[in-house]
Amino acid sequence: MEIKRFGNIEGKTMMLLHGNLMCWRQYENLIPLLEKKFCVYAVSFDGFDGTGETTYTTAQAQADKLAGYIEKELDGRLDLLYAESLGCGPAIFLKASPNIQIGRMILSGPEYLDFGVLNRLILKVMPQKQYRTAHEKYMPAWALRFMGQIEQGIQTMLRCIPDHISLESVRATWEAGLYLYRTDFLVQPDAKVACWYGEKEGHMKKAIQRLRTAYPSLIVRCFPGFGHGEIINHPALLASELERFLTDGGTERCAEGSGK
């Protein structure tokens, strides 16, 4: 795991967790828009830190490492945690850590990917396909449709794929995603948590229902016209929305019935 610090050490603290196959560089266009006001911590998970010496295992293991870092370096407190896709698993476990205080948390694109009896088949097929994506830097058409993304947006993501990603790490991320919502989440009635997603991405309705069992005051925000992770391709918008959420928590909700 690699954690990079940017910005104003006197500002409020913000931690960014990346999506699958990504690393901290997924936020390289966002960080310059935040670092004048905030102290920004950008994370690369085990298996995605470019060293070839670490392996992603579980979301809980990543959360434990982050908790240790926050406890040591930030006196156990973080003002805002932003997690994209894969990062949502570690974020949920980190929010439940008894030694860590997180003021506000945003889960962006925390899709419900549990397909029941099909999970085992998916684990036999999908990690190999995504492993090829990591090394060939190419996203097939079916993957674009699945994510609700366009080719231009995906090209931006592909440039952020780090070196030395192993098949073992990719498989572990798929297992983490498929089984995340079987976790017995800690109920946190007063937690200031938001779920953000793009209008074009699916698998969100069940995710929102499940997240509300842990965070009854969950704020849901749907971004019109966006696919999975696409908000990161709009760094100015993302920066302004992060600052707004950190300031007032936000009140906007998605339209009734959205979140397929």
Protein language model regions, located:
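Conserved alpha/beta-hydrolase catalytic His-Asp/Glu region
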Residues: 117, 133-187
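Active-site loop/oxyanion-hole signature of alpha/beta-hydrolase fold enzymes
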Residues: 41-80, 240
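Catalytic histidine-centered segment of alpha/beta-hydrolase-like enzymes
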Residues: 226-237
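Flexible "cap/lid" loop of the alpha/beta hydrolase fold
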Residues: 96, 100-133
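Gly/Ala-rich beta-loop-alpha elbow adjacent to hydrolase catalytic centers
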Residues: 82-87, 91
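Short beta-strand/loop motif that positions the catalytic acidic residue
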Residues: 189, 195-197
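Acidic catalytic loop of the alpha/beta-hydrolase fold
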Residues: 199-204, 229
